[in-house]
């Protein structure tokens, strides 16, 4: 069976400005871009197996994206990795905040209002591990 690969689209006002944010603030790279008349209209950004498409082609959809990004690690390692990610992103000036959707989230809003949710599935919204009784 063939593995599937998804690349969700985030709709943005200005792809070049969004590329600067995703690369400079969030640590992504950009393997390709589609340009027309000297302007970038679509680009892919990647980081550690996570691929997203940035596009300015549907203005009515700008800022309405929501992506859940999960780390494929054991729970303790995942918590440590997300805490390290938060420290890294805050050092670049990325707008990082706490969130909750039944469990703790690390939330980043891009310049257009699209949201990236990095989840801590091994913890409840209170910050306690699922098996923690204290």
Where do the PLM segments sit?
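Residues that flank catalytic or metal-binding motifs in active/ligand-binding sites
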Residues: 4, 41, 48-50, 63-67
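Core segments of cupin and vicinal oxygen chelate
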Residues: 9-51
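Short, charged/polar surface micro-motifs in flexible loops or helix N-caps
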Residues: 48-52, 59-61, 74-78
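N-terminal beta-strand motif that seeds the catalytic metal site of vicinal oxygen chelate
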Residues: 1-19, 67-71, 119-134
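Vicinal oxygen chelate
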Residues: 13-16, 67-115, 120
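Short acidic/glycine-enriched loop/turn segments that link adjacent beta-strands
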Residues: 37-41, 62-63, 100-104
């Amino acid at each position: 069976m063939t593995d599937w690969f998804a690349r969700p689209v985030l709709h943005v006002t200005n792809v070049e400005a969004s590329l600067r944010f995703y690369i400079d603030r969030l640590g992504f790279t950009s393997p390709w871009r589609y340009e027309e008349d000297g302007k970038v209209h679509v680009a892919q950004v990647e980081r550690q197996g996570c691929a997203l498409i940035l596009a300015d082609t549907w203005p009515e959809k700008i800022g309405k994206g929501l992506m859940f990004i999960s780390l494929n690690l054991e729970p303790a390692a995942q918590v440590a990795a997300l805490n390290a990610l938060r420290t890294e992103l805050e050092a670049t000036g990325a707008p990082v905040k706490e969130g909750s959707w039944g469990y703790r989230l690390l939330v980043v809003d891009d310049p257009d209002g699209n949201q990236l949710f990095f989840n801590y599935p091994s913890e409840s919204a209170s910050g306690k591990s699922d098996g923690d009784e204290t």
